[in-house]
């Protein structure tokens, strides 16, 4: 957990990945810092302070989801993104709103489990190596030293059998020590061994996914799994691959699942972030039965956001201190079209601005994961170094902005389409090109994109 970041530090970290949108960054930075402040309070006061949920308003592709996702990743908090349109009112077929909390707890369990695995990794690898030694130098089957039933009664011929067993054990121990040394030196990595691994069974309850009955299916499956034996199967693998599988198995045995569950539920309750996208799609004045159903979804979401207890396979989870970040474009509706009770549960409103040509230029080159850096790295694997002139980057940004204006505005996602079209031929022929360095010029951009961008009808289908 990295809750110690100051709001300014959080904004600086977000700047590494997201261009612009200062208001949204400030809002999430303050929300995160308030969690740290709350953790320092006395318990009686801490229970009274709930997080202030955020409503982000802005067109698609301007960074709403990315701001929330990077925020959660920054502090290592459990985070899930859900779409409001996927939920249905209680009583209808579909996912119920409580499933978002169950998904959050599952994410939290995975995060805590991964952390625990890292802690026991060394011990698990040591035990896996021990198992590999036993597989490579197996113990001989112990045979009874008595050939005649009467010998068992009178103790005959036992001494000679014990002596030979002791000698055999000594030889095996020497062999195992030799194999241990070779394993440690990495000399047996390509040796093939036969190991028994637990078989991953596909569940018949998978068909319940997305029907709103998945929780019932999981509970029933867990109940069956507790008394059904686990299936194992033999696999032939190299020592290197076998070590990975055995280390994972040993790590799972070393982890205390009760401790994992307890910590995961705590993190989900106190640090969890749920991002509800497309919330504008369930807003609207009552005019027909569809709108009534949308309002039903809003009313179902309300108690979750207000604070309630949700039953999960890991126990009851309180939603009082989960941070909810809702987002929507609100093209066809307004935030005031949400039911008043739900509006009141999102006190912080942030409007994200449309992206300009200058923003597109920055998106192409400035972030740590900038698009141009990605394409340069991909083509470098073929031995080709590509570079973009400043004028070419400006040209790409102008075309992306223009196509957004002429067709649907999909924000920064337009750059992915533009870049793919621009480098399509180069990516196709990269393995056959003998040139080591290629410079992308404004003329090249013009040649590949301008004719399509100028023709509105064509750009609707291609860009």
From Swiss-Prot:
GO molecular function ontology, one term from the record: proteasome-activating activity
Cellular-component GO terms for this entry: HslUV protease complex
Any matching Pfam family: AAA_2
Signal peptide coordinates: none
Gene3D superfamilies referenced in this protein's UniProt entry, alphabetically: 1.10.8.60, P-loop containing nucleotide triphosphate hydrolases
Broad class of where this protein is predominantly found: cytoplasm
InterPro entries membership: AAA+_ATPase, ATP-dep_Clp_protease_ClpX, ATPase_AAA_core, Clp_ATPase_C, HslU, P-loop_NTPase
Tagged with keyword ATP-binding: yes
Transmembrane stretches, start-end: none
Keywords carried by this UniProt record: ATP-binding, Chaperone, Cytoplasm, Nucleotide-binding
Region (Disordered): 154-174
GO BP term (any one): protein unfolding
Localization per record: Cytoplasm
Residues where ATP binds: 19, 61-66, 277, 341, 413
Function: ATPase subunit of a proteasome-like degradation complex; this subunit has chaperone activity. The binding of ATP and its subsequent hydrolysis by HslU are essential for unfolding of protein substrates subsequently hydrolyzed by HslV. HslU recognizes the N-terminal part of its protein substrates and unfolds these before they are guided to HslV for hydrolysis.
Family in the record: Belongs to the ClpX chaperone family. HslU subfamily.
Subunit structure, interactors included: A double ring-shaped homohexamer of HslV is capped on each side by a ring-shaped HslU homohexamer. The assembly of the HslU/HslV complex is dependent on binding of ATP.
Stated name of the protein: ATP-dependent protease ATPase subunit HslU
Organism: Bacillus cereus (strain G9842)
Gene expressing this chain: hslU
């Amino acid at each position: 957990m990295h809750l110690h970041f100051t709001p300014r530090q959080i904004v600086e970290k977000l700047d590494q990945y997201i261009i612009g949108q200062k208001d949204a960054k400030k809002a999430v930075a303050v929300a995160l810092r308030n969690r740290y402040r709350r953790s320092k309070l006395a318990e009686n006061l801490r229970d009274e302070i709930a997080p202030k949920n955020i409503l982000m308003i802005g067109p698609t592709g301007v960074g709403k989801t990315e701001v929330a996702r990077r925020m959660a990743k920054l502090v290592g908090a459990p985070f899930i993104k859900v779409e409001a349109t996927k939920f249905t009112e209680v009583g209808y077929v579909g996912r119920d709103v409580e499933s978002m909390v169950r998904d959050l707890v599952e994410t939290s369990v995975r995060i805590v489990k991964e952390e625990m695995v890292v802690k026991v990794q060394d011990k698990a690898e040591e035990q896996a190596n021990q198992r590999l030694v036993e597989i490579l130098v197996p113990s001989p089957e112990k045979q009874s030293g008595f050939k005649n039933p009467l010998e068992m009664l009178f103790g005959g011929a036992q001494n000679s059998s014990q002596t030979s067993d002791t000698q055999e054990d000594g030889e095996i121990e020497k062999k195992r020590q030799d194999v241990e040394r070779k394993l440690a030196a990495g000399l047996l990595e390509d040796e093939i061994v036969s190991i028994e691994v637990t078989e991953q069974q596909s569940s018949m309850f998978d068909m319940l996914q997305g029907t709103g009955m998945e929780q019932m299916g999981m509970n029933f499956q867990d109940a069956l799994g507790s008394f059904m034996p686990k299936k194992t199967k033999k696999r032939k693998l190299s020592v290197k691959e076998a070590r990975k599988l055995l280390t994972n198995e040993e790590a799972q045995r070393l982890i205390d699942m009760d401790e994992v569950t307890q910590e995961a539920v705590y993190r989900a309750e106190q640090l969890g972030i749920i991002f509800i996208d497309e919330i504008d799609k369930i807003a609207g004045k009552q005019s027909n039965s569809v709108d009534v159903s949308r309002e039903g979804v809003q009313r179902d979401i309300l108690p979750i956001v207000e604070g309630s207890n949700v039953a999960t396979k890991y126990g009851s989870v309180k939603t009082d201190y989960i941070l909810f970040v809702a987002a929507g474009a609100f093209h066809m509706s307004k935030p005031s079209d949400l039911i008043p009770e739900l509006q009141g549960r999102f006190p912080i409103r942030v409007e994200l601005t449309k992206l300009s040509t200058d923003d597109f230029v920055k998106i192409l080159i400035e972030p740590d994961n900038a698009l141009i850096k990605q394409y340069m790295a991909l083509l470098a694997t073929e031995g080709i170094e590509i570079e973009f002139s400043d004028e070419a980057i400006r040209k790409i940004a102008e075309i992306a902005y223009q196509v957004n204006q002429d067709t649907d505005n999909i924000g920064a996602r337009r750059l992915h389409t533009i870049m793919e079209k621009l480098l399509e031929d180069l990516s196709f022929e990269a393995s056959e090109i003998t040139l080591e360095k290629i410079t992308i010029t404004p003329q090249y951009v013009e040649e590949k994109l301008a004719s399509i961008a100028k023709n509105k009808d064509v750009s609707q289908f291609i860009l």
